[in-house]
Amino acid sequence: MKIALLLSGQPRRYRNGYKELKKWFLDRYDIDVYLHAWEAKEFHKFNFFNRGKLEKIHRVDEDLYDNLVNWYRPKDYLFEKSIQFDKKDIKGKNNQRLNSQMGMWMSLKRVWDLIDNSGIKYDLIFKTRYDLLFTHRVANTCPLLEDLTQLDPEYLHYFGYADNWPHTAYQMNDQIAIGGYDVMKVYCNLFPQMLNTIFVDPSYSDNYEDVFINETLIFHHLKTNNIPMSPIDSGFNGIRGLDCGCSIMR
């Protein structure tokens, strides 16, 4: 089975993030890695749950980008100067910023273009981030950690929310996504049409209270494109948090 791992976004907490991916995936499977990362001297982490205030500034190591290449040994990669998409600080009621949204989805589009240009049609494609913690957040018996190759490539797999999460009907966890080429092509190509979806498409803007939430945006995108989805049970039944899966290392 040909497997590709896509990493994109801001490479915060990349050292521990690499250890996690190495432990659970890179050491266990034959995986081709593709990287896209934004280049900057520092990355800002905002807290959506505290009125969008700045929570932490991550200083960039001088050897960060060299380390990414040396450690992951990617099939292909692109490091690109950070782009300011929005100077007006547009954000929704839940404090997610349009600028951050566009950076996230454009980075994913960039790394998808790398894999597409390779000409290799992978059986399974795994999209993730640089800063995720799986250990003690996801059970060893979870299908993702037990045997990645058993996931059906016809479906888009993602961590399911806890049963008591009130927005399950129209949101999905966006930390990871796994599927075959066809479903992942749709997932990774949200960026070219996201502004039209947010600001023009009435089927989106008229149906959701906050149009600037990534979890709502990607769920709507997949539903609109008739992509079959299959939530992954983390194995802890929600007792480790509503996201029911890996956590972002702050």
Language-model region placement:
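N-proximal low-complexity "stem/linker" segments adjacent to membrane-targeting elements
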Residues: M1-K19
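Local beta-strand N-terminus motif with an aromatic residue
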Residues: K2-I3, D30-I31, K121-D123
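Short, acidic, metal-binding catalytic loop of nucleotide-sugar glycosyltransferases
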Residues: K19-I31
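Catalytic core and acceptor-binding pocket of nucleotide-sugar-dependent glycosyltransferases
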Residues: R97-L114, G119, L133-A139, W165-R250
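A short, conserved acidic/glycine-rich loop-to-beta-strand motif
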Residues: L148-Q171
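Short beta-strand-to-loop acidic/aromatic patch adjacent to the donor-nucleotide binding site
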Residues: K121-L133
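Acidic donor-binding/catalytic loop of UDP-sugar-dependent glycosyltransferases
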Residues: Y14-R15, Y130-L145
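Active-site-proximal specificity loops/subdomain of glycosyltransferases
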Residues: H36-G119
